[in-house]
Amino acid sequence: MADDMTQATEAPRNFTINFGPQHPAAHGVLRLVLELDGEVVERVDPHIGLLHRGTEKLLEHKTYLQGIGYFDRLDYVAPMNQEHAFCMAAEKLAGITVPKRGEYVRVLYCEIGRVLNHLLNVTTQAMDVGALTPPLWGFEEREKLMVFYERASGSRMHAHYFRPGGVHQDLPMKLVEDIRAWCDQFPAKLDDIDSLLTENRIFKQRNVDIGVVTKEDVLAWGFSGVMVRGSGLAWDLRRSQPYSVYDELKFDIPVGKNGDCYDRYLCRMEEMRESVKIMIQCCDWLMKDENAGEVLATDSKFSPPRRAEMKRSMEALIQHFKLYTEGVHVEEGETYVAVEAPKGEFGVYLVSDGSNKPYRLKIRAPGFAHLAAMDYMSKGHMLADVSAIIGSLDVVFGEIDR
């Protein structure tokens, strides 16, 4: 009996475990060092950098056109949204105006990217808490969207489709019609996923009141995107500082109120419906005959001359050769451009010294700030809740490690 009493007064020993980097719920190469008291999380220490490729430094040694490809490889779930930010920064420094049709094509593909991202996130978040059907249904729809990417750019993921001044090529009318037809059937598929998850008792038990962040926390940690809107702040760059043609489009901004994993899930589900509304408006605009025209600024130094012109004119041939070897010299200056990427505010800070390559390019990845708060959000939760919280943060290591 005496021995039992002495054991009871001993200090409890916490133990440390590694979560990842090969864990399926880590959403990439994330290593979390977890300190546990029994099954309660005391401390979370994210170890990042396992996918670091030195993107920002590599961009300093590439021309502006060559640099676009690196942005596809950041958040590789929705590549064109990142290209958009970089092209807008280059346009701002070079003083290029994008033709209206080019802007509508850009917005259409940015919203396809948003649906691609949210479909992956919502369905894998369900998989993290034990539901296997949603990913199978969601990936079927993602596959169709990947085909739209491929039909526009030739590639399913690393599109390299946006250019400073617009987009590389106009969309075939059949493709626009197919996207429009997809928009009509997709909400029913979304309802199917909705019916499986939203009122599901197990799904709610695993997500409600897990990983709560208040409005004050959101501002203090520098969150953006769904992480902000899930806590009740209607902050969306497409509405608060409109870029491209978002000010001409009608859409709502879904907002949560509790700031937990469940509200963030609901926000993403609703955002997909809003993205479909935007896609329908873009397709309808692009299909009108009076809106035909250029998709790439013809007066821009970034635009290559047409093939027919190159066969006739020596100057056009020289311009083409110079554009793809030396690249374009962009005026000296610096600028910051942010877009509302699916994960939050994706920003590009571009400094030009007047040469054909960026002098410095800083990438502001939204997931980086979200992962930084992992310790704060997980403290006091159970070990099983850690994967639910990571799932609702929506992290991709291409952009976090860069």
UniProtKB/Swiss-Prot annotation:
Q: Which species is this UniProt entry from? A: Maricaulis maris (strain MCS10) (Caulobacter maris)
**Catalytic activity entry:** a quinone + NADH + 5 H(+)(in) = a quinol + NAD(+) + 4 H(+)(out)
Query: What does this gene product do?
Result: NDH-1 shuttles electrons from NADH, via FMN and iron-sulfur (Fe-S) centers, to quinones in the respiratory chain. The immediate electron acceptor for the enzyme in this species is believed to be ubiquinone. Couples the redox reaction to proton translocation (for every two electrons transferred, four hydrogen ions are translocated across the cytoplasmic membrane), and thus conserves the redox energy in a proton gradient.
Membrane-crossing ranges are: none
Q: Which GO terms describe its cellular component?
A: plasma membrane
Gene Ontology MF term list:
NAD binding; NADH:ubiquinone reductase (non-electrogenic) activity; quinone binding
Tell me which domain of life the UniProt entry assigns to the organism this sequence originates from.
Bacteria
- Kindly provide the name given to this protein in its UniProt entry: NADH-quinone oxidoreductase subunit D
Q: Which membrane topology describes this protein?
A: Peripheral membrane protein
Q: Which UniProt keywords apply?
A: Cell inner membrane, Cell membrane, Membrane, NAD, Quinone, Translocase, Transport, Ubiquinone
Which enzyme type, at the first EC level? translocase
Q: What is this protein's gene name?
A: nuoD
Q: One Pfam family name from the record?
A: Complex1_49kDa
Which proteins does it associate with, and in what oligomeric form?
A: NDH-1 is composed of 14 different subunits. Subunits NuoB, C, D, E, F, and G constitute the peripheral sector of the complex.
Q: What is its main location?
A: membrane
Matches recorded under InterPro entries: NADH_Q_OxRdtase_suD, NADH_UbQ_OxRdtase_49kDa_CS, NDH1_su_D/H, NiFe-Hase_large
The record's listing under PANTHER family reads:
NADH DEHYDROGENASE [UBIQUINONE] IRON-SULFUR PROTEIN 2, MITOCHONDRIAL (PTHR11993:SF10), NADH-UBIQUINONE OXIDOREDUCTASE 49 KDA SUBUNIT (PTHR11993)
Similarity annotation? Belongs to the complex I 49 kDa subunit family.
- Stated EC number for the protein is 7.1.1.-
Q: What subcellular locations does the record give?
A: Cell inner membrane
Q: HAMAP family attached here? A: NDH1_NuoD
